[in-house]
Amino acid sequence: MEGFAKPSTSSGSGVTVRASVAAASIEERFADLCKAKLGLDESTTRQAMQLLKETNNILKSSMSSLGGGSPEEIERFWSACVLYCVSRLSKAGRSKEDGSVSLCQILRASKLNIVDFFKEMPQFCIKVAHILTGLYGSDWEKRLELKELQANVVHLSLLSSYYKRAYQELFLSNDGKSSDNSSESNNQEASDYYRFGWLLFLVLRIQTFSRFKDLVTSTNELVSVLAVLIIHVPVRLRNFDIKDSSYFGKKSDRGVSLIASLCEKHHTSEDELSKALEKTNTLIMDILKKKPCPATSACQQDNLSFIDPEGLTVFKDLLQGDSLKPSLIILEKEYENAINTKGELDERMFANDEDSLLGSGSLSGGAINLPGTKRKYDVMASPAKSISSPNPMSPPRFCLSPKGNGFCNSKMAPSTPVSTAMTTAKWLRNTVSPLPSRPSGELLRFFSACDKDLTDDIAHRAGIILGAIFTSSSFGERICTSMRSASRMDAIWTEQRKMEALKLYYRVLESMCRAESQILSGNNLTSLLSNERFHRCMIACSAELVLATHKTVTMMFPAVLEKTGITAFDLSKVIEGFVRHEDTLPRELKRHLNSLEERLLESMAWEKGSSMYNSLIVARPALSVEISRLGLLAEPMPSLDAIAAHHNISLGGLPPLPFQKQERLQDKDEVRSPKRACTERRNVLVDSNSLRSPVKDIIKPKLPPLQSAFASPTRPNPAAGGETCAETGIGVFFSKISKLAAIRIRSLCERLQLPQQVLERVYSLVQQILSQQTGLFFNRHIDQIILCSIYGVAKISQLELSFKEIIFGYRKQPQCKPQVFRSVYVHWPPRSRNGKTGEDHVDIITFYNEVFIPAVKSLLVEVGPGASASPKKKEEEKGPADVGPFPESPRLARFPNLPDMSPKKVSATHNVYVSPLRSSKMDTLLSPSSKSYYACVGESTYAFQSPSKDLKAINNRLNSVSGGKKVSGRLNFDVVSDLVVASSLGSDRDAKPAADPAKTTPVKCEPSDS
């Protein structure tokens, strides 16, 4: 379990002294890291030391939940996280001239890799959030830009892999496979050309975009670099025959059409590639000082043989002879000047497979949803690795070795995230861009058929909301360059994306109005088309699809919600309709919307500030007290005038909308978007209809019309038998929660090989909790309830299943996030038995014992193996939609029952004994019938990796030095707490025979992993 176990010594003063020595040692090592290895100035070092000291107690309690390795490794993680926060949040850290350091420097000095850093940094932020708020203000998370930096790393890793595959397909490399007769000098020459292309792309990327580093535009720039290489790299290094290569399929009478062929190969447009190539040529002239050859000259004739020169610019001696080395030096200097000003990452490392910073694993992790085929690095479950570098501050090396890591894979896949993004962008370019930027004639007729012509109001609103989303301030505060060309590109980019979102909004709105008019048998859609929240949701959904298509780094979901003033729960009401009414929507964008809806259902709709609570207090008045006590209600939705003023948007002389003030009075469901990430999904949620639900009274088989979905929660719904719109909406929402829970329960239970009846009991328990103990979902993740339900049902079913095993299975689930079981929200009542009060975050076992079991113990009894429902109750639970239980699952593979015995020596070289868990204070606190519900105090949520890695972790704990003193008295197997082991070692002969754990023991004891 998370946290340090209590020491077994009886000397309190001795413990204090050792803790002080350990803290002093950590501070000494941290000071050496700041001054000797990183060369920080006094001001930055002082701020870093302050943050380290204030978080020291949290570090001690996080030894089992951060990094997963030795205490020394966890300390290095913590130090790196502290330094990154200080470098980004402190005033001195905003400029490199003021003594700040980049993330790359921090990681090299700490001997960590970037993948492991991004795995652990979110945990650090959760644990020290209140301290960071006190030191740096409430907006520290936005200023930290952690998600944006992670997205940028993911994009660069994908682009580097894409570039590597394309280069190796076109040119000889230094891997020894393309040319058996190539000499060492030729290999180095090939590597230099590869390096030139990547550096040219990086400089172009910095010069062109100050903020909007989206994946699609970056890919266009990368393809333009390939075009430059094709016509300038010496012919002897080509890996293709220009006349016969299938790579160049577009030909004319004058030869191969290079631009058209590259567009066909890389799914871009000739117009976009021509513009990108023009910018690349301009950069070569401005920075490398190369002059283009006249069209009639004879330069580069060998390279242009059988190539149509139209639209191409050739530079004399750009990559010939002795000109390559000087060009590399100039590009290196240009790039270094840029990253030394504001850069966090030395992006040159992505062209080097062997760079120690890259590591292995996935950086997507749910926060960044990149479409495409299954990636090699989908799951990060391995313990963090210590990465050494011979010279931490040395520049990265470049290589073309096919030996890839998590970032580079030399095997050309049929579909990659980059190629998928380019294909999706093609849909936007071919289907949406040609549409008019004004409503069609049919849509105008719907607007004019309302009680009042709403044409001007709708156009007015769209201008303000899209202006709020697509502004320079929306895409971060940091600018990589002050070049005017970058600012011009920003303005062009935002205007293009804004127009695409506007056209998509009008297109889908027309289709929705057509369908709604058929449902209502009339064209008067005043109730829907005058609803402020509905239009904002539609605009937000359109903008999100445009941003998701281009894979922007800085405007990832849920940024559009905050800009539009809505919540994720609001947006979920239009997601299904949006997908249904846009037939041409690509599969990847449908998946994106589905994933957003799933993220909403699993956690974001339950967060503080969700408009769901405003409907829930109407549908379930009994919950209003708890909702108010926790402060969960949403804030009012900001007016259009407020949004326009906040983003400095001109209103264009249009008068304020007449219905805005009325909306504030009528719609009590208005909210401002929560600041934390939130998201949604739908497709998979409608596929599971085979489950009996004890809450069928709140689940409706059909979705209501949009008018009722966006009506005031207290308004009666005429199509639902007199119930309020809130009851209808909550019923639909709960039905989706039930289906999502069913899918995840089935998946996890089958992975754990649990029996069929256990699977159904778990589902029944979750349904009962949703119906009768809804408050357990408040501010929590649905998976936290599922994990606890599985363990509780396993306990009452007398199964040999530990929380550790459940977490190990959960780690393999595609939606797994470590925060789910490491940090569970609790709000301690004034008289809690542990003495704590107020808000807190605990591990899942503490939540299970302290909150979950007291709330659901009676429900567990009802779903237990001895429970028997009356025939009448069974008949009530069986609805017309019932089509049977879960399909048969694999049977449980039971663990052997081990006899209880005296302490057993488990090591030949160490005096280490393991004894079965004995009675504790819980014996006196729990009745015999209640003991079987609780989780073992010493149980861990840390999943094992493999026998060898587990033994290595045990040895690290045995041999580790903490605070200068070797740990010799206690052994943490991560299964039983140190206190239990110590008490067991103190009494060797008092063991009792094993008994049925469901009847006599307060907790389930587990055999050691050793």
Swiss-Prot record:
Region: Pocket, residue numbers: 416-858
Protein family per UniProt: Belongs to the retinoblastoma protein (RB) family.
Keyword Nucleus on entry: yes
Pfam families (UniProt xref): DUF3452, RB_A, RB_B
Subcellular location: Nucleus
Keywords annotated in UniProt: Cell cycle, Nucleus, Repressor, Transcription, Transcription regulation
BP-aspect Gene Ontology terms: cell differentiation; negative regulation of G1/S transition of mitotic cell cycle; regulation of transcription by RNA polymerase II
InterPro entries: Cyclin-like_dom (IPR013763), Cyclin-like_sf (IPR036915), RB_A (IPR002720), RB_B (IPR002719), RB_fam (IPR028309), RB_N (IPR024599)
Region annotation (Domain B) ranges: 728-858
Regions annotated as coiled coil: none
Residues covered by region (Disordered): 867-889, 986-1010
A cellular-component GO term for this protein: nucleus
Region (Spacer): 617-727
Lineage, highest ranks first: Eukaryota, Viridiplantae, Streptophyta, Embryophyta, Tracheophyta
Species per Swiss-Prot/TrEMBL record: Zea mays (Maize)
Record's protein name: Retinoblastoma-related protein 3
Function summary: Regulator of biological processes that recruits a histone deacetylase to control gene transcription. May play a role in the entry into mitosis, negatively regulating the cell proliferation. Formation of stable complexes with geminiviridae replication-associated proteins may create a cellular environment which favors viral DNA replication.
Highest taxon in the source lineage: Eukaryota
Alphabetized SMART domains for the sequence: CYCLIN (SM00385), DUF3452 (SM01367), RB_A (SM01368)
Chief localisation class: nucleus
GO terms assigned for molecular function: RNA polymerase II transcription regulatory region sequence-specific DNA binding
Domain A: region residues: 416-616
Disulfide bridge map: none
